Amino acid sequence: MSIPSLPAGYDVTKRVGSGRSDCHITVGFDREGTHIPRFLVLLHYQVSADPLQWDAIARMDHNETAALGHDIYKEGLHVDIARRYESAVHVEISDNLLPSIRGIVIRGCTDYLEKNTQYFIDVFEGDQSAANPPKWPDGGESPHTLISTKHVNTGMSKEQSREDPSEEVISMDELTEILAEAEGVTPEE
């Protein structure tokens, strides 16, 4: 099976089932003891069958360690959305109060991308505006902010597919267990 690459440069990387054959979700995160200081969640979309090519069309991330990193606890959640024929957009997603347990936030990001895959594909293809994105599961009420930025494109990946049967696709529940173990909590917390 041809698949997009896992995020590079992270302590832990996983591929999570997306429920679609034309999409993959990948997750990368770092560990410092039982703390996760940075993570990346990507939604990959198959943009070409011949040659097979995957693009990362939606990106959610957190990095509290880098000077130019995005700290979701200070700046809020956002999604960078690639567009096929225009520059990428940065959409701020309102949330009420994010849990301090990063694993819960990462799982929330994977759920958000999985449940709203068609929205991200439609924005990528130009069939829908990025304005008024789906709400974050906690129902945050602040208005969404849409910022068109060209620098977002440089962080999104366009890659050829690759073969690696050793990289299994895990379920959302398996991801939850991995994240809980990384933070030294139980999956129910």
Model-inferred region functions:
Residues 38-82:
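Acidic, aromatic-enriched beta-alpha/helix-loop junctions
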Residues 1-2, 151, 159:
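Short Lys/Arg-rich cationic patches that frequently serve as NLS/NoLS or arginine-rich RNA/DNA-binding motifs
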Residues 1-55:
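Negatively charged, low-complexity tracts enriched in Asp/Glu with abundant Ser/Thr
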Residues 13, 21-23, 73, 80, ...:
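Intrinsically disordered, low-complexity, compositionally biased regions/tails
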Residues 63-151:
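Mixed-charge, Lys/Arg-enriched low-complexity segments
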Residues 155-189:
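DE-rich, low-complexity intrinsically disordered acidic tracts
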